[in-house]
Amino acid sequence: MKNKKALFIPLFIIILFIAFFNKIINFIINIKWFKEVNYLAVYFTKMRAIIILMIPIFIIFFISIWMYYKSLIINKNKSVVDIGLNKNNYGKKLFFIFNFIVSIFLAYIFSSSYWYRILQFNNSVDFNVKDPIFFKDVSFYIFKLPLFESLYKVIISLLLFLVITTFIAYFILEAKYKIQSKKDINLKNINHGIKSFAGKQLAIVSGLIILFISFGHLIKIWNLVYSSNGVSFGASYTDVHATLLFYKIIVVITLISSIVTLLSIVKGKFKPVSICIGITIFLIVSQNIASFLVQNFIVKSNEKTLEQPYIKNNIDLTRKAFALDDIEIRDFDIKNDLQKQDITDNKASIDNIRINSFKPTLEFYNQVQIIRYYYTFNDIDIDRYNINGKYNQVFLAAREIDTDALNPNTWQNRHLIYTHGFGAVMNKVNSVTSEGQPDFVIKDIPPYNKTNIKLANPRIYFGEKTNDYVIVNTKINEFDYPKEDSNKTNKYNGHAGIKMSFINRLLFAINKKDINFLLSKDIKKDSKIIINRNIVERAKKIAPFLTYDSDPYMVIYNGKIYWIIDAYTTTNRYPYSEPYDSINYIRNSAKVVIDSVDGDINFYITDKKDPIVNNYAKIFKGLFKEEKDAPKEIREHFRYPKDLFSIQSKVLGKYHVKDPGVFYNGEDLWEVSKDQKHVEGETNTNDAPYIIMKLPDQNKEEMVLLNYFNVMKKDNMIALFGARMDGEQYGKKILYKLPSDKTVYSPYLFKQKINQDTNISKELSLWNREGSKVQYGDTIILPIKNSLLYIEPLYLRASGKNSIPEMKRVILSYNDKLVLSSSIQEGIKEIFNSKDNKINDKNEKDSTKTIDDSKLKKAQEYYNKAIEAQKNGDWTKYGENINELGNILNSIK
């Protein structure tokens, strides 16, 4: 028997080791990886905080539970206690082990769950904004109140756990005693039995529970700034004048009740306790009744007047939380009085009008430029570059390896040979080839480059599709890129990776559950494993507390490809701010820059005024760098992020209104304009475009992210909202309010105008015959001085699985003029060379012209030939026939 007991502890330790074996391996690998990326201090910040917290928490839990246990076995008046708990030392040893395990487990759970909130509490940074009810700085609600709430929940849960386990222990031991003594169980003596067993202990615990109910209502008071009971988010009239008063009374009464409970139960007097509990319950019920009465009999009939100051609080703090309080607002009086000189003065804006659209361009990239089946383009990025001395907006994408497409998909192919993507593709957004496809300035493998942008090392070891580990510098050469009938190979010369010593091979074999790490003869001592190669996951691994943009974008700099990810600080704890998408505060506080070859990752603070990112910087020393430390050539490519802009646009639709009375009436609500992608398709929310333009009153073109607003449930455009991003203008926002007494075409209304035009709709119908389909591109509405120029690219897609949309025409509209042209330049000439103020003469003549049947037959013939060539994969013939079709359509026009 003694031998069995002696074996228990070692056996238990072995079981624990096996249970936590994988965590130990992960911990060792994490240390190696964080050391490799030079963020080991960041990793140890968390580990150190957890360990430092665990020690005192473990001591508190262990001593509290042990003392509670000791206090129970001291009661010798109850025989069940002697039999069940105090018979021999073995029970004490067993409880000691149990207490140790439970205490260390609870300490770990608490520390690993709340270390972050404790560090935020200790490193709080003021917002210098006070809430209008309790006049506390916003930092209290974001950095301190969450910790109070967590402590409250944990302590209340533990106290209730003690009460429940005490009752369970009593009933188990009582049953054991009755069975051993062969006595009947008498439920009438339960009250006396529990008092004898744990009366004082339960008295103390009950008093503490009531004390923390008081603390809980104090937390409820502070949480009134998040109330959703009124007409706007935040504390309402009823919350302030009824709910708050009752909460304060409950706090005081429960505080007194906790003291009375402790004193009364110890003395055996239960009447005062019953009175205190009854009063507390009465007040809680009364609070709900009082709030209901105030809301329905005082506020409801005078809501607009009584709620105005609270609505104003909501407006002011929501605008501040979503960074809408610094928008420059201007009236945009549409005159449409452009002269030819104005066109000349805005030539750079017009030359950069985007006629290529995202989706068709990505399809074309993946049809024409993947080179081999295992390459892929994940998405299209838009940016601006100085190309051969000119400021150009471009589309570009990285050519990555899709390891899931490898055939055969062997371990060597996946992890040792096909280790990286290769190269990038770039085209200007403002031009297409004669076939209506993107006109490449960088393409092919090895890169064919018509620009001054150097791309000496185009390899992509880190990207959006690099989701698996690779091992480099092995005995097998890495595949670099295909070259005619052979393959070009490469040896990795970057500094990323963990050396594959025997110990590390063993660690990764266990971690990845793959014996190949040990069996492979291709792995050498100086081979390196590169893990966490997905750029977003790499950033999350280092800084999981940041929120990352859904669209990382690539930049070509210093002969290599770099990735930029926008990182946000968010919270749902900003007082009085209306939540959108589960958050009520957001800042684009950091840019993450990642080297696609070496994997170097840097976090640059781009919003020094954000208290949350400054709080993180105080906690994680060495994580963030200043924006000025980023290379100038990288900073020039920082974009205003579309995810942030989209959220701000949603909020602005309601919170452009500053007057509480107008806000209450809901009479001036906006929504982001709708758009239509197909001639007979459904509408969807317009995707805000990045546009190169010269803002009114500015003398230089810049890239602007622009959104169009309609009046809610109407199609008339009411405003233009733009975010600037070039140089010192980065982050500045501007709102142009359009005349409300005029019909201003939104993207959707513009599409309706196109569909209603006799001449254009006739041509669309001709193209949209069976076997082909007309698609709209991305609608652009370009402000030029006090005028609006509308642009709509038209794509023609042939039937067939692998058909590629071709940009065939551009529709331009200005004032009352609407033209269908082969290019932007031709359309501009057609509009501004016209003498009248309506549809140009050419279109008017066309409206009465009959179409030659022979030309229609010829058009059908060339179209059929093009479709046949496409099915056969003969793209040369396809292009020739489509060109002939275009010539016929032009002659009909």
UniProtKB/Swiss-Prot annotation:
Q: Which InterPro entries did the record assign?
A: UPF0182
Which UniProt key words apply to this protein? Cell membrane, Membrane, Transmembrane, Transmembrane helix
Q: From which domain of life does this come?
A: Bacteria
A family per Pfam? UPF0182
- The keyword Transmembrane helix appears for this protein: yes
Which Gene Ontology cellular-component terms appear in the entry? extracellular region; plasma membrane
Membrane topology type, per the record?
Multi-pass membrane protein
Keyword Cell membrane among record annotations: yes
- The portions of this protein that span the membrane are 9-29, 49-69, 94-114, 154-174, 202-222, 246-266, 273-293
Q: Tell me where it resides.
A: Cell membrane
> What NCBIfam families does the database record attribute to this sequence?
PRK00068.1 (NF000825)
What's the name of the protein? UPF0182 protein CLB_0018
Q: Which organism is it from?
A: Clostridium botulinum (strain ATCC 19397 / Type A)
Upper classification of the organism: Bacteria, Bacillati, Bacillota, Clostridia, Eubacteriales
